[in-house]
């Protein structure tokens, strides 16, 4: 659904919301704690990609949530940094 030279975005195979998309860097970074200061432009780019995809999915006006999990207690299950984009319904706070 989105790809450029630094990132790609695709639908989650086990969605937790009507819109549940993963935005991932092409660079191998295990998790947010492993990102280096040199990765700051890439991390910002992931957020920009998420906003672009949210507009494409038509959820920009109603709202969406971005999540990065770190560690098992947070629900991290894939050892590659990724941003979850959730939307398409009202999202409760606090989550979980």
What are these language model-derived features?
Residues 1-96:
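HIT superfamily nucleotide-processing domains
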């Amino acid at each position: 659904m989105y790809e450029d030279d630094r990132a790609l975005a695709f639908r989650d195979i086990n969605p937790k919301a009507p819109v549940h998309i993963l935005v991932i860097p092409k660079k191998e970074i295990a998790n947010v704690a492993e990102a280096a200061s040199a990765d700051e432009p890439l991390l910002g780019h992931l957020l920009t990609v998420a906003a672009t995809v949210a507009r494409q999915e038509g959820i920009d006006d109603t709202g969406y949530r971005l999540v990065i999990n770190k560690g098992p207690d947070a629900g991290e299950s894939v050892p590659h940094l990724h941003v979850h984009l959730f939307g398409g319904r009202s999202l409760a706070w606090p989550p979980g």
